[in-house]
Design a protein with these regions (language model features):
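Flexible, charged surface loops at secondary-structure boundaries
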Residues: 37-41, 71-74
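A short amphipathic beta-strand at an alpha->beta junction
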Residues: 66-94
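Hydrophobic, Leu/Ile/Phe/Ala-enriched alpha-helical segments that form helix-helix packing faces
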Residues: 16-24, 64-69, 73
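Short, charged low-complexity intrinsically disordered segments located at boundaries
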Residues: 40-45, 91-94
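Residue-identity detector for glutamine
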Residues: 13-14, 29, 59-61, 67
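N-proximal, solvent-exposed amphipathic alpha-helical segments enriched in charged/polar residues
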Residues: 1-38
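Hydrophobic beta-strand residues in large extracellular and virion-surface proteins
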Residues: 33, 44, 78-80
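A short interface-forming secondary-structure element
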Residues: 43-63
Length: 94
């Protein structure tokens, strides 16, 4: 019998990304959010492939992204992509 609670790292990761999305409601729902290993660090990737016309993050939104990432300990940096092309990179400030 399978437990109703599935405590796998993939499930925790998905729960953290779902919580992150709930904290940064200004991001388009069609944007993709994932974490990627980058050398010895982990980066949060926000991909605007499905909505390139909506790629715009202002200074206040960047601050909110940093707060949400730090509160959930998700990553050291943010990568903004449109498809496979990196269009921005920000180091998360403590």
């Amino acid at each position: 019998m399978e437990s109703p609670l599935n405590y796998t790292s993939a499930n925790f990761e998905q729960a953290a990304l779902t919580k992150f999305r709930s904290l940064v409601t200004f991001l388009p729902q069609s944007s993709k959010i994932c974490r990627e290993p980058w050398g010895r660090s982990t980066v949060l990737c926000i991909n605007f492939e499905n909505c390139p016309h909506l790629f715009s993050v202002n200074q206040e939104q960047t601050r909110l992204l940093f707060q949400a990432i730090a509160s959930l300990s998700l990553a050291d940096s943010i990568i903004f992509r449109i498809g496979s092309k990196i269009v921005g990179w920000k180091k998360v400030k403590p």
